[in-house]
Amino acid sequence: MTLSWPSPAKLNLFLYITGKRPDGYHNLQTLFQFLDYGDTLTFTPRNDTQLTILTPVEGVADEDNLIIKAAKLLRQYCYQHHIPLRYQGADISIDKKLPMGGGLGGGSSNAATTLIALNYHWQAGLSDETLATLGVTLGADVPVFVKGHAAFAEGIGEILTPASPKECWYLVAHPGISIPTPTIFTDPELKRNSPIRSLGALLQAPFANDCEMIARKRFREVEYLLSWLLEYAPSRLTGTGACVFGEFESQEAASEVLINAPEWVHGFVAQGVNISPVHLFRSRIPVLLHP
């Protein structure tokens, strides 16, 4: 059975860095929400063990693609735990809409969708909790995509508490550049001492992103784009960038700003959703049983 699975974007509605750990990672507090917009991954199970990307991503070798890494990780876990699989290979196509290095979680989302989809197609029968534990070895953001609910994240992003922020409409704009995460986190001027607060306190305060000042200072494209968007709506950087987003009360309001935007502005309008489109899709497809 061939199925096309959503691989949604995420936004960091706020992001505060509360300290740097001895191992070099940063402790943070952030609020993840999904978007009803993203990539689409199509999986066709194979009777052999081949894992083939039919639509290679430019600049990313197959062996470095998180999709392939996730598939191999799932298969290896099942081998090690003597879990029988209906299939062990797959042909995979990617309809790529999310920019790399954009702060929208595209790679992590692809990995999570792969774990969820192949768990279904291969009939491995693993729980989302197990898939999330596998996923964190691929990236700190993978578990939130696997678990599929908007969440308040702490620690390095691995401590998740389900949350239900308002499902607003957003204009998400991309400045045409990629920002590697280490570029932001290694900057000596990055704020690393935000106070640790409860989710309730954070929801009552104006939302902000501690990475934004560095991104605006080091990348003029981000500065120009955010300055433009702030004229129309409360706007922030997502993650470590490079994408920015403005918050609107309606799809029409966000779309009107995008339609009338300068030619150099590239973006899309999407709604924030607290249940991942991947989980909604999975709930609507038939349960597969071993023959």
Curated annotation (Swiss-Prot):
Q: Which residues cross the membrane?
A: none
Q: Name one Pfam family in it.
A: GHMP_kinases_C
EC numbers on record: 2.7.1.148
Domain of life per record: Bacteria
Keyword Transferase attached: yes
Q: Name one GO biological process term.
A: terpenoid biosynthetic process
Named in its record, the pathway it takes part in is:
Isoprenoid biosynthesis; isopentenyl diphosphate biosynthesis via DXP pathway; isopentenyl diphosphate from 1-deoxy-D-xylulose 5-phosphate: step 3/6
* Molecular function GO labels: 4-(cytidine 5'-diphospho)-2-C-methyl-D-erythritol kinase activity; ATP binding
Q: Where does ATP bind?
A: 99-109
InterPro entries given in the database record = GHMP_kinase_C_dom (IPR013750), GHMP_kinase_C_sf (IPR036554), GHMP_kinase_N_dom (IPR006204), IspE (IPR004424), Ribosomal_Su5_D2-typ_SF (IPR020568), Ribsml_uS5_D2-typ_fold_subgr (IPR014721)
| Keywords attached to this entry | ATP-binding, Isoprene biosynthesis, Kinase, Nucleotide-binding, Transferase
Q: Where is the active site?
A: 10, 141
- Catalytic activity entry: 4-CDP-2-C-methyl-D-erythritol + ATP = 4-CDP-2-C-methyl-D-erythritol 2-phosphate + ADP + H(+)
Q: How does it assemble?
A: Homodimer.
**What NCBIfam families does the record tag this protein with?**
ispE
Q: What is the similarity comment for this entry?
A: Belongs to the GHMP kinase family. IspE subfamily.
What the protein does? Catalyzes the phosphorylation of the position 2 hydroxy group of 4-diphosphocytidyl-2C-methyl-D-erythritol.
Q: Which protein are we looking at?
A: 4-diphosphocytidyl-2-C-methyl-D-erythritol kinase
User: Source taxonomy lineage?
Assistant: Bacteria, Pseudomonadati, Pseudomonadota, Gammaproteobacteria, Enterobacterales
